[in-house]
Amino acid sequence: MPGIGDDFYRKSKYTRGNLPRHRLDWSSKPPTYKRYDSVQKIKLPTPSIEGGIGLWEVLRRRRSRRAYTDESLTLKDLSQILWATQGVTAHIGDYDLRTAPSAGALYPIETYLCINRVSGLESGLYHYSIPNHELDLIRSGEFGEEVSKGALDQKMTERAAVVFIWSAVFQRSKWKYLQRAYRYVFLDAGHIAQNLALAAEALGYGTCQIGAIYDDELNQLLDLDGEEESVIYLSSVARPQRQNERA
């Protein structure tokens, strides 16, 4: 039976000769980065761009892994994975180019972390500051159970060393692409998640990407309004037990 998804897809199509036309208001362009100014900052180790196993081998190995050991993630490896997801790789004019593509280089996706076991970091909720390659400590404490509940009670998120929580700041893309921006936002999240899956695999960690969430439970956990910014995607990361592998 047709529903709102079918309606959205149909109404957001581009058709020849009927493209939406609007003048971009540069004075109202949303900020590219979200900032937490009055929180503790944790500078991350400089990521490496040399060495590592080959891309083709990483692609061959990649699986969704749901069974994890109790081993902690190292801060160095977390830094490497964060940079791989959407770290800055170059500067052209006013644009910071990143490891993942984004429609119009507008980068609507923000990265939050639920840290359960990372050496040198206290457990808590963090935000990844991309331009500074550092972490913003939002709240200290154990939040694995709450994240698990927000992920439809999938326990692998509670057992993971880290859970990546991606949100979308929709207006960053809507400013240019109007309603079609919602297509691009989710594509952007997919690019980022695949970068994470490959980087983690290259470092010997397992990941599982999760789209089944109670949106507003996770929004409340991160103090997001669910309108201007909302959680859209998760990924667990941990050292895997080599079993229960699926696509």
Q: What is the predicted role of each segment?
A:
Residues 180-188:
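Short pre-catalytic strand/loop immediately N-terminal to key active-site residues, enriched for Gly-Thr
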Residues 172-176:
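Short acidic/His/Gly/Ser-rich catalytic and metal-binding motifs that mark active-site loops
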Residues 1-166, 170-171, 189, 203, ...:
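N-terminal accessory segments that position/regulate proteins before the catalytic core
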Residues 192-197, 202-206:
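C-terminal folded domains that constitute the principal catalytic or ligand-binding module
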